[in-house]
């Protein structure tokens, strides 16, 4: 509202000045007197001081330019929104790729761990089987050695028994072999030993003959 008053006063002063220049000197004096009478000098100066300079560079935008500006701003906002959405989508894709890589690495680690565990168990089982085979071989060898030792002792006893119980030594090696291979079926004659000793010798001979297959257990005396 103040601006309108200032503009009205400004145009009034301009019109007043123009009218004064087009009249005669008498009219000028009369108009000056009238203006002075209507507007006192002090009041006029006071009003002039209140006036502010009006810029002549005022910009007037047309409705079309305004609409174009709004449309451009809207397009720019949409562009920024799309850029932000694309950045967000790219960030989500990157996080998904990273998660997939981590899951793949974890699966590979578990597979390698399971393979190593299976290999360890297979190796342990193989070592256990080798140990069982070794122990079985040792036991078999020990059993064979024990059997050989027992047979050797039995043969030595059979060899020593006739020579120690016989009154006369055998005249030849063939007689010794015959004595060893043919067990006595009856008690020997009295050769200076007691009955118990001769019976034991007889039983040993029969047992040896059964083991060697010379005497049938059912026919043993």
Swiss-Prot record:
Residues 67-221 are annotated as: Disordered. Residues 152-161, 175-184 have a biased composition (Polar residues). Residues 70-161 form a coiled coil. The keyword Coiled coil applies. This is Uncharacterized protein YscB. Keywords: Coiled coil, Signal. It comes from Bacillus subtilis (strain 168). Residues 162-174 have a biased composition (Low complexity). Residues 1-23 form the signal peptide. Residues 68-150, 195-205 have a biased composition (Basic and acidic residues).
């Amino acid at each position: 509202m103040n601006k309108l008053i200032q503009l009205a006063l400004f145009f009034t002063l301009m019109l007043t000045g123009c009218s004064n220049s087009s009249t005669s000197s008498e009219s000028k004096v009369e108009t000056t007197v009238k203006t002075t009478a209507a507007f006192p000098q002090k009041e006029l100066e006071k009003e002039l001081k209140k006036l502010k300079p009006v810029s002549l560079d005022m910009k007037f935008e047309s409705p079309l330019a305004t609409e174009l500006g709004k449309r451009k701003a809207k397009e720019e906002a949409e562009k920024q929104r799309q850029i932000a959405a694309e950045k967000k989508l790219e960030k989500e894709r990157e996080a998904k790729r990273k998660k997939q890589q981590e899951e793949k690495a974890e699966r590979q680690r578990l597979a390698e761990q399971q393979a190593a565990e299976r290999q360890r168990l297979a190796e342990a089982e193989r070592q256990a089987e080798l140990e069982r085979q070794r122990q079985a071989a040792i036991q078999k060898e020990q059993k064979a050695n024990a059997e050989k030792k027992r047979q050797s002792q039995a043969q030595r006893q059979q060899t020593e028994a006739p020579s120690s119980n016989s009154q006369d030594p055998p005249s030849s090696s063939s007689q010794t072999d015959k004595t060893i291979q043919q067990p006595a079926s009856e008690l020997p004659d009295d050769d200076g030993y007691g009955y118990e000793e001769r019976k034991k010798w007889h039983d040993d001979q029969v047992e040896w003959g059964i083991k060697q297959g010379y005497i049938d257990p059912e026919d043993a005396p």
